[in-house]
Amino acid sequence: CIRDRVHAIKQIANFKTNATLSELDVRDSLNKYLPLDIRILDAEKTDNRFHARLNAKGKHYRYTIDNGEVANVFERKYMTRLTQNYDIEAMKKAAKLFIGEHDFKSFCDNKRMKKSTIRTISDISINNSDGIITIDFYGNGFLYHMVRILTGTLLMVGTHELSCDDIPDIIEKKSRDAAGF
């Protein structure tokens, strides 16, 4: 299922404290209490007004799909396994249609969204190397489940369930039912 296997790499977070620990002590102290599959790599003092999510200069999401003839047993926890044949060139062509500023309401899973659904995607790259498909999304921000739905839509283009010609109509409809899984 495309909905599992979610991971964060080099995620930025922030918190406020009155503690007088060094950055190294903050890192080491937090790591003592975290499970082994979650690690603080670095800590630094910031301006009091800094907010990791609100001050982000951009966001990057990656979907990794194991599409090889034989499942990758070593990386399986970090990939979704899909065995269909995908037309990567069609997916790349469709991805170009998402670049720029658009109303991505069709790609949002929040029916009660009160804020603007207009977002800007600066780049989408799709690569297939040795049966591993990576889809990278870069933008100024993303809606609830937007990247997941965009990925599903691109995969449907890759299996020819949708065509590139469908993408402008899906964007225009502003309906979650119009987009991919």
Describe each model-derived feature in a short phrase:
Residues 4-181:
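Structured-RNA-binding interfaces characteristic of tRNA pseudouridine synthases
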Residues 1:
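Active-site loops and adjacent core secondary-structure elements that bind or stabilize anionic groups
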